Swiss-Prot record:
It catalyses: L-threonine = 2-oxobutanoate + NH4(+). The keyword Lyase applies. The modification N6-(pyridoxal phosphate)lysine is found at K53. Its EC number is 4.3.1.19. Catalyzes the anaerobic formation of alpha-ketobutyrate and ammonia from threonine in a two-step reaction. The first step involved a dehydration of threonine and a production of enamine intermediates (aminocrotonate), which tautomerizes to its imine form (iminobutyrate). Both intermediates are unstable and short-lived. The second step is the nonenzymatic hydrolysis of the enamine/imine intermediates to form 2-ketobutyrate and free ammonia. In the low water environment of the cell, the second step is accelerated by RidA. Transmembrane segments: none annotated. It comes from Halalkalibacterium halodurans (strain ATCC BAA-125 / DSM 18197 / FERM 7344 / JCM 9153 / C-125). Belongs to the serine/threonine dehydratase family. This is L-threonine dehydratase biosynthetic IlvA.
Amino acid sequence: MGKIQIEDIIIANQTLKDVVVHTPLQKNQVLSERYECNVYLKREDMQVVRSFKIRGAFHQISSIPKEELNNGVVCASAGNHAQGVAYSCHTLQIPGKIFMPTTTPRQKVDQVKFFGKEYVEVILTGDTFDDSFNEAKEYGIKHKMTFIHPFDQEKIVAGQGTVGMEIMNDIDDNIDYLFCSIGGGGLISGVGTYIKSISPRTKVIGCEPAGAPAMKESLKQGKVIELEKIDKFVDGAAVKKVGEIPFEICQKILEDIVLVPEGKICTTILNLYNQDAIVAEPAGAMPIAALDFFKDEIKGKTVVCVLSGGNNDIGRMQEMRERSLIYEGLQHYFIIQFPQRAGALKEFILDVLGPDDDITRFEYTKKNNKSNGPVLIGIELKCDEDYHRLMDRLNKKGFEYREINKNESLFNLLI
C-alpha cells in the first residue's frame, strides 16, 4: 500500500486508544431506505475535537523524540488540524504556535485557544491558508520548532488510518463501498490502506469538492499538481495541492473519485440536520452527498460513509440554504425591467407568479424620466418543474429580463 503499512496503523491505534474517542459506526435508516442498501456512518463528528484530525496530530507529535520538542511544535491551519494540534499540545504539555489566516472566524480561533489552553499561541497572519502555511514553516525553521503538517507526514496518515481500523472492528458485514472525503488526502489514504489490507474487495470512493479537484487532477496527470484557483466553500477539503504521501497511496487504493457540487453538499447538510439532528461540516457531509451519484451501483450493498467532522459555523446556515435551493433548481434571481407606473408590481404577481411561487428578494429604485426601472428579484419555487412554467409566463407578458443564475459575474456581484 505504499509507505504506510497496516502495522503502522495498529501501532498508531495503541498510541491513541486512551486519547481519542472510539466513535460509533451507526446504520442510518433514512439513507438505507432511500438508496435501498445498508448505509453506515462513521461518526467522527463525535470525536474529541469534533473531527478526525486529533488522531493524526496526536500520533505525529507523540512520536517525536523529546529532545526535538524542547522548542515546541508549529502548524498552519484554518480549522480542524489546528484544534487537533492544540489539544495534543495541551495533553502532552508541549508549547505550540498555530498560524491561522486573518480571515479565520473568531469561533474557530476561540476553539483552538480553548483546546490548547496556556500551551498554545495563535498567530493570525496572511489572507489565505497558503500565506499562513508558508509563514509557519519559516517560523519553525527560524526558531527550531517541529512542523506538524496537516496531511503529508507518515505518522499523520497512520493516525488517520485508525478510523478504518475501528470501522473494520465494528462492522459485521462485508463492506462493498467506502466513501471518504479528500482534502489533502491524509484521511482517505490512511483509512483506505487499512480497509483494503483487510478487505481487498471493498471499493474505496474518494469524494472531492467540484470546486477543488486537486487529487482527481493529480491522478489524471500522474503527479501532484497545484490548482491555480479553488472554491473555498468546503473549507475542510478545499486545497490547491494534495500531499505526496497520500497521492502515492491513492494511486493504489482508489476505485474512483467523484466530484461533488457544493450545492449538493449543502442540501445534504440540511437533510442530515433536519432528519437525523446531525450537525455535519461541508467536508463531513460530502461522502453522503456522493451517494446520489452511485445510487444504482450501491443498491443492495453495504456502504460506509466517513462523516469526518461536525465543526460547522452556524452563521453559514443561511448561505448553505441558499446554495442548496439554487442547486436544486428552486431559487432563481432576475433583473427585470418594470414599467414605472402604478399597478405594475400587482400585474407581475397576478400574471407571472404561480400559486406556490414566493418572492424572497425585491430591490427597486425608481428612475425619474424613464419608462422602465430595473428590479432585482428573487423567486423561490416549490418544485423545480415550476421553473419552465414561470419562464413561459414571464415571456408571454413581454418583460425584459436577465437571469442572474446563468451569469456568474452578475451572480457573484449581486447575490
